[in-house]
């Protein structure tokens, strides 16, 4: 924890430098960052699970306390307006005494609607950063989520501080523990629902604490890209298992996927091939490389795998250009990762908001930037038997290039995805996920 505290001090220094630059550029006095506030369910007296403003938790690991505020100007010590109501119905947040608390000034807010008493008097010279524009209106903010400010912050958020990298390594360590437990549960005969409970128990995080809804899919369900339905009964025949699940540490996310076959067969061999391909793509990563080009290169490598396994016929170039590989691999190679699972800034060409478009043939790619030092990204290629996409392909001449017998053999297994979290260094790539022992 002492090391984390030292790294956090430098983390704040970097954030303050960024704020100073954008305030000077935009002629602002500072930023007032709202943690957020509860959302009430329609026609109910219950709130949805609270999700903190990512720009708030970029500064400090307070992720579960709505109605809090952060006042920063890049020069003075950040002011945290910490919400601590008098409330006998709910658990009230403890007074902060963690490693980060000494680095900020703290004032306690007992009534959410009294926050104006703690905000700067010249509020029209400050920008509001947050979700609740109605609150910003009432408080008198003239500038609310300026595009220029958000573009600047989102662009530079891609470059992680050493504190952030330390948090993400820990988030990977935690998630790997859960993945290993989930794998054992699969081979022991657990249902999707039971596997998820094993995973969450192993990482000691609840469904609302993990950074995204975990995907736990058996057999054909593995072909559903964002499958979260969870069957409570184990299938009569156990063939395959895909788990896409992460963990949270100090507000930073890990995002890891693994696929398994219950027996040694063609599907198990295909998992090995995709795993090897994923590692080959990671080896191509270095500063200056276009992430979009890595995605395209993945399609060429996948085309060769499809040929090797007699899933398709033709040649590598033609399979990619005709979009046949996209039928089997319809999503992007991955995305930026940080305080959000899909971290902002993946399409920004500079800190003024220039947009780098996705390749026309690959509309679902989530990152088009060039790689740079201290960026963190996921690499998650896959191959799936998705009936809706294959049915479209059946309607044109490309259907003759599909070995439908092999497709039928693979259909009951669903799909494969292998996902690691990697850091781009100046002279190497750090695979956080594999470094904690989660290999094939």
Swiss-Prot record:
Catalytic activity, per the record? Answer: Xaa-L-Pro dipeptide + H2O = an L-alpha-amino acid + L-proline
The transmembrane residues are none
What EC numbers are recorded for this enzyme? 3.4.13.9
Question: What keywords are assigned to this protein?
Answer: Dipeptidase, Hydrolase, Manganese, Metal-binding, Metalloprotease, Protease
Q: Which domain of life is it from?
A: Bacteria
CDD domains linked to this entry? Prolidase
> Which parts of the sequence bind Mn(2+) 1?
255, 335, 380, 419
Q: Which GO terms describe its cellular component?
A: cytosol
Any idea which positions bind Mn(2+) 2? 244, 255, 419
Molecular function in Gene Ontology: aminopeptidase activity; metal ion binding; metalloexopeptidase activity; phosphoric triester hydrolase activity; proline dipeptidase activity
Task: Give the cofactor note.
Answer: Binds 2 manganese ions per subunit.
Q: Which cofactor does it need?
A: Mn(2+)
For this entry, list what GO says about its biological process.
proteolysis
Q: Which InterPro entries match?
A: Creatin/AminoP/Spt16_N, Creatinase/aminopeptidase-like, PepQ_N, Pept_M24, Peptidase_M24B_aminopep-P_CS, X-Pro_dipept-like, X_Pro_dipept
This chain's function reads: Splits dipeptides with a prolyl residue in the C-terminal position.
Give the UniProt family note.
Belongs to the peptidase M24B family. Bacterial-type prolidase subfamily.
Q: What is this protein called?
A: Xaa-Pro dipeptidase
